[in-house]
Structures are given as C-alpha cells and as structure tokens.
Amino acid sequence: MLEIPTLFDVFAEAGKEVAIVAVNGCSIDTIFRRRKVDYYSFRTDAQSFEMTKKLLEEDKYDLIISYYTSYDHLSHKHGPYAPVSEDALETAVRYFEELTALTDRVWQRADRVIAWVPDHGNHVVDEHSGTHGTNTPEDMVVNHFYRLRAAE
C-alpha cells in the first residue's frame, strides 16, 4: 500500500468528496486503501465503467478516479501489441470518450478537468508477453492527456 499523501488525500482533507472506482484487487484498488475516500470495487472493468457513469449522474463527488485494468493485464499476458491487448486499449479509449462526454453534460455548470493518466508504459518480453518496470523509454515515457473546461 502507498502511504505517502496523494492528490486523493489533498482533496479529501479539503472537504471534497472523492471516489476510486476499479476492479477488485488491481493495483489502484489496493495501493490507495485506508484513505478518507469512497471505494467501489468490481469484478470487471465493464462494471467499474457502469458505476463511474452512475456516480457522475448522481453528482455527489468532486473527484472520481475510474481505473481501467484490462489493457495492463492483457499486455502482460499477451504483449502490448497483441490483437487482444489492442482491443482492450480501444475499449479504454471508448470508455474515456464516453465518460468525458458524460462529465461535460453532468458538470457543465462547473469548472472541470478531464485527464487520461497512464501509470506506466510497457514493452515486449517475447512473442507472448509484455512487462514494465525498467528504465527504458517504452516503460517510462507515457503520454498524459488532460483538458480544462470552464463552467458554462
């Protein structure tokens, strides 16, 4: 478990409502436990995605972290460029686009930030698997995307 203060802690200590939505047992679900945030853990990414949409519609939270784990899992098992891994990445992009549109609709009267923040890269180990954690560009150089949107 990660014990240093994080963005989640800063928001919670400032009186903001924070939710972490993820697959049960994945890294994000486990390393940020024991914080003053609400946790929603599910068996699949699809269930996490549906809960994230529900939480956005309820408009209770100031910060929602929705973590998609399938690409990471499948790229370890099959390699980052395997068709099944690429399909999972396409699903992640589709989920992000849908959540972005929903956030813009639900939170249109609020200033907001939408962010796509991968936690690491990945490289091919052999023809059947991938991994991360080395000091190589494939593992260390990741693109983060964000958009600031003013209240309407």
Predicted segment positions?
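Feature captures the catalytic ectodomains and active-site-proximal regions of enzymes
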Residues: M1-E152
